[in-house]
A protein has these predicted regions:
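Short, glycine/acidic-rich hinge or "gate" loops at secondary-structure transitions
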Residues: 39-56, 60, 128-141, 164-165, ...
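Alpha-helix N-cap/helix-initiation motif
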Residues: 15-23, 48-52, 83-87, 102-105, ...
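AAA+/P-loop NTPase substrate/partner-engagement loops
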Residues: 46, 58-109
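Extended alpha-helical interface modules used as scaffolds for assembling large macromolecular complexes
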Residues: 88, 94-95, 104-107, 111-123, ...
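Conserved beta-strand scaffold positions in the cores of enzyme catalytic domains, especially
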Residues: 44, 71-72, 146, 173-175
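Acidic/polar loop patches that form or flank catalytic/metal-binding clefts of enzymes
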Residues: 40-44, 70-76, 124-130, 154-159, ...
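P-loop NTPase catalytic core of nucleic-acid-dependent motor ATPases
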Residues: 1-72, 245
């Protein structure tokens, strides 16, 4: 192929159609080799969504065609994680492209978060030599970006369905989820077909120019990084977004006729597209932040059937039942008791809430939330104490005193079977 034909195809497909979201993702293919001019080893793009024909595969083909064959350059869904790391090491600064991680992610929902974290660390895993008690020399490293496609929306899983905290991984990748099928004219279809005939030429021209102009490249990447940090308001924990967007924008500038003369792209539109993706990710993180109350409510929701519920009856006596509504009777094993709720038992108009500390600590660990932080945060708004509580008191059961977290709230008109924690007036 030749560079002019490649340029015409990109111009017809991306620029004339004003497909700036797709173009921004595609320009990251040039930006990948600029990652070594930042302080970071890697960045991740994910193209997701269940709708077909929206441009995910086209974007991957366009990115692959910058450096090699649009199809054979990228790895397939059957590639093992170790092989992917080896490929990233061999490509070094060229982008790693992974097509269809849907089945891999569904088989192991923790695969993608782990992969995102590992790739942005820039180094393969350490291994031992099979014939000696010593480590192998680990020369599998990289400074590059990776782009993955799937039918999933990773931010939905990592910000909601995932039980563990995902803030670190969420801030190391950006996601594009197109949902409008693309329609093509005959001329545009010819341009799409041309991508499979003219490939590998743009990347070669770009890397040759970068090698000859490293000081100019480094200066522009650093300036772009600083400008985007100010323009997009990147904070310290958003540094990977800053690096990933900076390399893409810098590549969009360096490929212009003012520098390497490869292709002129609308830089401002690309910046707007990147800004939109960053703002979407910020919104996801903002809405997914877990508070101590969220952790407590999650414990209640998952375990309320194992709570002992005591309610004061009209005659002044108390009646005990399980949270699922079944009556409390006969001997009970300790492991079945997951909490205790007392409705107006000790004080009229108040509900007392007890959970064994050991169980609550295990729950906090499972949700990646420090127990000490949990108590401190909860104490900012509610009266929280640690007491020695007989979890079977007033049930005719044996003595069962444990260290328990005690929360007291005012009873409201809400249903008694729900346990929203509300500020307690003191």
């Amino acid at each position: 192929g030749d560079l002019d034909s490649w340029r015409d195809a990109w111009t017809t497909i991306f620029i004339k159609r004003k497909m700036y979201d797709l173009l921004a993702c595609a320009m990251d293919s040039f930006g990948s080799i600029l990652m070594q001019f930042t302080q970071f080893e890697g960045f991740v793009w994910h193209l997701g969504g269940k709708t077909s024909g929206t441009g995910k595969s086209l974007t991957l083909s366009a990115k692959a065609g910058v450096w090699g064959h649009p199809v054979r350059y990228r790895t397939g869904k059957g590639t093992s994680p170790v092989a992917m790391q080896n490929r990233a090491g061999m490509l070094n600064s060229m982008p790693l492209l992974i097509d269809e991680i849907t089945s891999t992610q569904r088989d192991n929902m923790e695969w993608a978060p782990g992969f995102i974290f590992n790739h942005t660390e820039g180094q393969g895993k350490e291994r031992m030599e099979s014939s000696a008690n010593k480590e192998r020399i680990n020369d599998t490293n990289w400074h590059s970006t990776v782009t993955m496609t799937s039918n999933e929306v990773l931010t939905d899983y990592m910000a909601g369905a995932r039980k563990f905290s995902s803030n670190g991984e969420l801030r190391r990748f950006l996601e594009w989820t197109p949902n409008v099928p693309l329609q093509w004219t005959s001329q545009e279809l010819e341009a799409v077909r041309a991508l499979k005939l003219h490939f590998g030429v743009a990347g070669e021209a770009f890397i040759r120019w970068v090698v000859r102009n490293q000081s100019t490249t480094r200066r522009l990447v650093e300036e772009t990084y600083d400008q985007l940090r100010n323009e997009m308001g990147f904070s310290g924990d958003e540094r990977y977004w800053n690096a990933g967007t900076a390399t893409t924008v810098a590549a969009s500038i360096l490929t212009s006729r003012q520098y390497s003369k490869i292709i002129d792209v609308p830089v401002l539109n690309i910046i707007d597209s990147l800004k939109d993706k960053v703002n979407r990710s910020r919104a996801v993180i903002r809405n997914s932040i877990r508070t101590a109350e969220d952790v407590l409510n999650a414990y209640t929701r998952d375990n309320y059937g194992g709570f002992i519920v005591l309610k004061r009856q009209p005659n002044g006596e108390t009646a005990a039942s399980w949270g699922d509504g079944s009556m409390f009777s006969g001997p009970v094993i300790r492991s079945k008791i997951l909490g205790r709720v007392e409705f107006e038992v000790t004080k009229e108009g108040y509900v007392d809430y007890f959970i064994e500390e050991q169980l609550l600590k295990e729950h906090c660990v499972g949700m990646s939330y420090g127990y000490s932080d949990f108590k401190v945060e909860l104490s900012k708004n509610y009266v929280v104490t640690v007491v020695k509580k007989d979890m079977l008191a007033r049930t005719k059961g044996p003595l069962l005193r444990v260290n328990a977290l005690h929360i007291c709230r005012k009873k409201t008109h809400e249903a008694e079977d729900s346990l929203p924690v509300e500020p307690t007036e003191t």
